[in-house]
């Protein structure tokens, strides 16, 4: 009988302990040392997802981990994806395709089927590589959930993985969390734990030695490393908790004449694919902040309505908070000279339209039709078929996504180098679509222009004639360095600032993954890790 593929698994004492990032780090370290390595997470609960080349959906974190391995994204890396669409239910995606919406008890009954799919995916993927790096979810010691576990110790046992238990020391109480987690594990689960890793440490690590002795004395498990707090990694946040924490509390306005652009992301209860903002956050002349109420809006240069897993529900939330009225009020009536540019992506794009219809009850248990924000004269009809595809598109000649008010559209002049900022041949953009529903311009409902188109001429984005409002289904539209800088420079001209005129920040995860790997390699006893895996270091 063939020996199992060596496997390392990162589990945590809590959510947001850093499992996803550390999984990516170990993937890149093993790759650097000459091993064929692949990531795996049996079940991911996330609204950040990614589409494979063959049109299948999986968690975004596994796409980043695949990049760490320099592999194409493969749905086997995350065979089960749960996308919450209410407080008690989720869309269940198995091997990249939705199998239905389920409430908690329904999914509990379905879990044996999901676990079969996860094990089969793991076995198939593991057969293709030298070593696997698995990621757990939440905590393995949730006593009310352990009986139905398919992602933590049950998966570790199937993979015969060596488990490293990760604790977030920045939040305090990490040693109690480690000991408490071990106490709540069954004996066979404790046997799978090979050691502890502390994450997000700030300070002098030598001061931790007394705690090591106490915890190791109680658990019999060694500490294999202390990973420092890593600033500005340039990698996507692993979940909405860390994303919101990162961007919360920013100043509501950029000082006039300060040279920085103020870009606002409207928070949604079921926000999805907030990684669409990652590339903008890397730009040195941009401040991105999350807002939840009209009072927080200030006077931004641009407002982005992001994707949503429950578009109609999140639209209702915007209305109840007063945000819908505030956004409409910011849509200036004088051709966009004063108001911010308003951008909708996927669900946010649907919300900006005149009407949203859900005749099949895709997002709820009954058919309904709701008025949209009315910012774009388009109508969306939800459908049971889910669009999952990668898309390449080009901007319409001369369009920069910031409107004619700044003189950046063809034939308007504008100065400040604006004409050079919007090339006649258009910008190439690439991304992916994940949505239910089809959006079409209203017949006679007001002017709307195509601003993005695919190679066959199919529209991929729409804008008002003045360019102040535009929307697209294309996730990753701002990842394109040229378009992103052109859009930002157009915003700068609207503000009366000089355009930068060149790409200053490239959105490239590979150097960031190398920096991450270097930091973790220097903080963790890799000789011990290799001995656990039964592998010699290579380099």
UniProtKB/Swiss-Prot annotation:
Say yes or no: keyword Cytoplasm present: no
Which GO biological process annotations does it have?
Answer: cobalamin biosynthetic process
Question: Which keywords describe this protein according to UniProt?
Answer: Cobalamin biosynthesis, Glutamine amidotransferase
Pathway in which the depicted protein is active:
Cofactor biosynthesis; adenosylcobalamin biosynthesis
Tell me yes or no: is Phosphoprotein among this UniProt entry's keywords. no
Gene3D superfamilies tied to this protein: 3.40.50.880, P-loop containing nucleotide triphosphate hydrolases
Active site as annotated: 346, 475
Q: Which GO terms describe its molecular function?
A: ABC-type vitamin B12 transporter activity; catalytic activity
Query: What are the GATase cobBQ-type domain coordinates in residue numbering?
Result: 260-483
PANTHER family, sorted: COBYRIC ACID SYNTHASE, DETHIOBIOTIN SYNTHETASE
- Family named by the database record: Belongs to the CobB/CobQ family. CobQ subfamily.
Its annotated function is as follows: Catalyzes amidations at positions B, D, E, and G on adenosylcobyrinic A,C-diamide. NH(2) groups are provided by glutamine, and one molecule of ATP is hydrogenolyzed for each amidation.
Quote the protein name from its UniProt record: Cobyric acid synthase
Instruction: Tell me which species this is from.
Output: Nitratidesulfovibrio vulgaris (strain DP4) (Desulfovibrio vulgaris)
């Amino acid at each position: 009988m063939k020996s199992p593929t060596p496997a390392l698994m990162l589990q945590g004492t809590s959510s947001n302990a850093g499992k996803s990032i550390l999984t990516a780090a170990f993937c890149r370290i093993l790759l650097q040392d000459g091993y064929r390595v692949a990531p795996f997470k049996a079940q991911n609960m996330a609204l950040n997802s990614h589409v494979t080349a063959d049109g299948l959906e999986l968690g975004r974190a596994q796409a980043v981990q695949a990049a760490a391995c320099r592999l194409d994204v493969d749905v086997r890396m995350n065979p089960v994806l749960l996308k919450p669409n209410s407080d008690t239910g989720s869309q269940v995606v198995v091997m990249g395709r939705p199998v239905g919406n389920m409430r908690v008890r329904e999914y509990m009954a379905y879990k044996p089927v999901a676990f079969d799919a996860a094990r089969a995916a793991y076995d198939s993927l593991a057969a293709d590589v030298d070593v696997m790096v698995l990621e757990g979810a939440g905590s393995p010691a949730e006593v009310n959930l352990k009986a139905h576990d398919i992602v933590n110790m049950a998966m570790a046992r199937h993979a015969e993985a060596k488990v490293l238990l990760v604790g977030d020391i920045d939040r305090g109480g990490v040693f109690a969390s480690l000991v408490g987690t071990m106490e709540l594990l069954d004996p066979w689960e404790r046997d799978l734990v090979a050691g502890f890793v502390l994450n997000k440490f700030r300070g002098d690590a030598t001061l931790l030695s007394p705690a090591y002795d106490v915890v190791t004395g109680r658990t019999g498990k060694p500490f294999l490393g202390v990973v420092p707090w890593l600033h500005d990694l340039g990698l996507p946040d692993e979940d909405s908790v860390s994303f919101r924490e990162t961007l919360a509390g920013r100043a509501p306005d950029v000082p006039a004449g300060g040279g920085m652009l103020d870009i606002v992301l409207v928070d949604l209860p079921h926000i999805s694919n907030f990684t669409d903002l990652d590339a903008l956050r890397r730009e040195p002349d941009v401040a991105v902040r999350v807002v939840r109420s009209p009072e927080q809006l200030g006077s931004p240069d641009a407002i982005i309505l992001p994707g949503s897993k429950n578009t109609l529900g999140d639209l209702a939330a915007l209305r109840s908070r007063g945000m819908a009225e505030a956004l409409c009020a910011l849509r200036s009536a004088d051709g966009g000279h004063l108001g911010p540019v308003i951008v909708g992506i996927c669900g946010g794009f649907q919300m900006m339209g005149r009407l949203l219809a859900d005749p099949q009850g895709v997002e709820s248990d009954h058919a309904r039709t709701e008025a949209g924000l009315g910012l774009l004269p388009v109508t969306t009809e939800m459908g049971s078929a889910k669009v999952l595809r990668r898309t390449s598109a080009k901007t319409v000649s001369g369009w920069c996504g910031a409107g004619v008010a700044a003189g950046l559209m063809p034939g308007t002049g504008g100065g400040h180098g604006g004409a050079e900022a919007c090339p006649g041949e258009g910008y190439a953009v690439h991304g992916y679509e994940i949505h239910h529903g089809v959006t079409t311009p209203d017949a006679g409902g007001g002017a709307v222009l195509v601003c993005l188109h695919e190679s066959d001429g199919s529209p991929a984005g729409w804008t008002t004639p003045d360019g102040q409002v535009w929307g697209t289904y294309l996730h990753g539209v701002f990842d394109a360095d040229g378009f992103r800088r052109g859009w930002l420079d157009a915003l700068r001209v609207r503000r009366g600032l000089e355009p930068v005129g060149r790409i200053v920040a490239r959105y490239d995860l590979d150097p960031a993954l190398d920096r991450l790997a270097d930091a973790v390699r220097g903080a963790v006893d890799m000789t011990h890790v290799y001995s656990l895996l039964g592998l010699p270091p290579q380099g």
